[in-house]
Each structure stands twice: as C-alpha cells, then as structure tokens.
C-alpha cells in the first residue's frame, strides 16, 4: 500500500517520484542511518537501498566503491537491524531493497523475504536475476507480501516487456540506457517508446533509472512518460567525496535533493 499511496499522492499534485539509491552501511552503519534520515527529511518519495555485495556486476565504479566501503563491516544481521531502525524512524515511506541474487540465495530465499517483511520492507529488486528465473522468488515474495520488481532494459523485446510489466509490482524499473550504473551528462536514449509499451501492458508506474543526475533529466523523463526517476551514482558520489567531513556530506546531500525534487 505504501507505493500505491505514494503514487496516488504524487499524481494528485502532478509530481514525479524521486527515489534515491544508496548502499546500506556505506560508509558505516551509523553514518548510513544519518544519510538515510537526511534523504527522508529532504522529501524523497521512497528509498532504494542496496545490499553490499563483493561482485556488483550491474554497477559502475562509483557504486562499486560504495559496496566495497560497506563490505568492510557489513553483515546481513546488521543490514536487517539498520532496516528495522529506518522503518521505526518513518512508518510511511516506501522502502525497496536492491540486492544481488547470490546474497538472497545464500541466505535462503524464504528466510530473506520473511526478514524483509519483518523489517517493513515494501519491495525487492534482484539486479542480476533474469525474468525467466522469477519463479525462484515470486512465491516467497507473495507469501510475505513483498512487491517483486523487475527491470525493463532498452533492448528488450515487446514480449519481454509484457512479462516485466505483468509481473512487476509497486513499480517497473526502466533502464534509461544499457550497461552499468553511473551518472550521465545527458540522457542518451529516448525511452518514450519503452515506457509507452510498458504502459500498454500494465498500469504499474514506470520509473527511469541509470544516469539520472540533473534536474533536466527528470524533466526529460517526465516528457518520455515516466512516473518518476531513481537516482544513485550522483548521490553516492557526494558520499565518496565527503568521507572525511560528515556535516558537509549531509549538507551537500540535502542541497542535491532540494535541487532535484520539484
């Protein structure tokens, strides 16, 4: 219900969803919590939180580095502790997890989704799991009332997009370009065709991710028919560049979010 409520409220005010991505536990668990509180206070629509992994193949160098920083002290037990703390801090904001398949399968699929539910998580996106393998997780997701999100890539066939649109819950993650994550100067591709195709198959909101780093990118995404954007690398870069100055980091994050939301 949290995603539904969020999108209904945004639609009423003719606003785009702005969802930031950060890696949980980067650069440490204490500061990670302060970063996430700052994001919430700054007015983001929802949270997308990555679970640190040793081989984040879908990510570019900025987010890879955040995984490495978090891995110095990360554990699944600590991840779930922090997630509970975040949910206790704010009961209404939608919280999504972005994880790599190996983390979930080594933990145990049903146990992972059960813990996610316990922590008040709303959705899970598995970065490196193709749609064809959805049956491996979908029963556990449904059992524990977690929305399973799938990725729509620019080179996907119409048939694949139909599957993504049909099976994604909460929202659909539409990639603005192929390749790995990373901030872009310009949005390289016109994603209006892929978004139009997704919307023909399902009313589930489509969010554009990969390369979102400027306000104009959000304006462009809106023009393409997207319901919102996911922004990761540009935000994680602020964390990376201010590791030695916590106050400056949080102020710059606040300023960045303030400049992106409209």
Curated annotation (Swiss-Prot):
It is an enzyme of class 4 (lyase). Pathway: Amino-acid biosynthesis; L-tryptophan biosynthesis; L-tryptophan from chorismate: step 5/5. GO terms for cellular component: cytosol. The active site is at residues 48, 59. It catalyses: (1S,2R)-1-C-(indol-3-yl)glycerol 3-phosphate + L-serine = D-glyceraldehyde 3-phosphate + L-tryptophan + H2O. Pfam families: Trp_syntA. Its EC number is 4.2.1.20. It comes from the Bacteria. GO terms for molecular function: tryptophan synthase activity. InterPro entries: Aldolase_TIM, RibuloseP-bd_barrel, Trp_synthase_alpha_AS, Trp_synthase_suA. GO terms for biological process: L-tryptophan biosynthetic process. Keywords: Amino-acid biosynthesis, Aromatic amino acid biosynthesis, Lyase, Tryptophan biosynthesis. The alpha subunit is responsible for the aldol cleavage of indoleglycerol phosphate to indole and glyceraldehyde 3-phosphate. Tetramer of two alpha and two beta chains. NCBIfam families: trpA (TIGR00262). Belongs to the TrpA family. PANTHER family: TRYPTOPHAN SYNTHASE ALPHA CHAIN, CHLOROPLASTIC, TRYPTOPHAN SYNTHASE, ALPHA CHAIN. This is Tryptophan synthase alpha chain.
């Amino acid at each position: 219900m949290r995603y539904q409520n969020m999108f209904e409220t945004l639609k009423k005010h003719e606003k785009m969803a702005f969802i930031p991505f950060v890696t949980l536990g980067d650069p440490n668990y204490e500061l990670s919590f302060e970063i996430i509180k700052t994001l919430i206070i700054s007015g983001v629509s929802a949270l997308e939180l990555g679970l640190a992994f040793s081989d984040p193949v879908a990510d570019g160098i900025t987010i890879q580095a955040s995984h490495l920083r978090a891995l110095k002290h990360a554990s699944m037990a600590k991840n779930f502790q922090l997630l509970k703390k975040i949910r206790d801090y704010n009961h209404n904001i939608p919280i999504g997890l972005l994880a790599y398949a190996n983390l979930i399968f080594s933990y145990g699929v049903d146990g992972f989704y059960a813990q996610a539910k316990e922590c008040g998580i709303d959705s899970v996106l598995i970065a490196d799991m193709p749609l064809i393998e959805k049956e491996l997780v979908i029963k556990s997701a449904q059992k524990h009332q977690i929305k399973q999100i799938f990725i729509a890539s620019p080179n996907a066939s119409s048939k694949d997009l139909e599957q993504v649109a049909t099976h994604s819950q909460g929202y659909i993650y539409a990639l603005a370009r192929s390749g790995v994550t990373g901030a872009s100067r310009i949005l390289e591709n016109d994603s209006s065709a892929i978004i139009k195709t997704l919307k023909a198959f399902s009313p589930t909101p489509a969010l554009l991710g990969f390369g979102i780093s400027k306000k104009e990118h959000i304006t462009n995404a809106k023009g393409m028919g997207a319901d919102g954007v996911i922004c990761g690398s540009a935000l994680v870069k602020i964390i990376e560049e201010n590791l030695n100055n916590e106050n400056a980091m949080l102020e710059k994050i606040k300023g960045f979010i303030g400049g992106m939301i409209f």
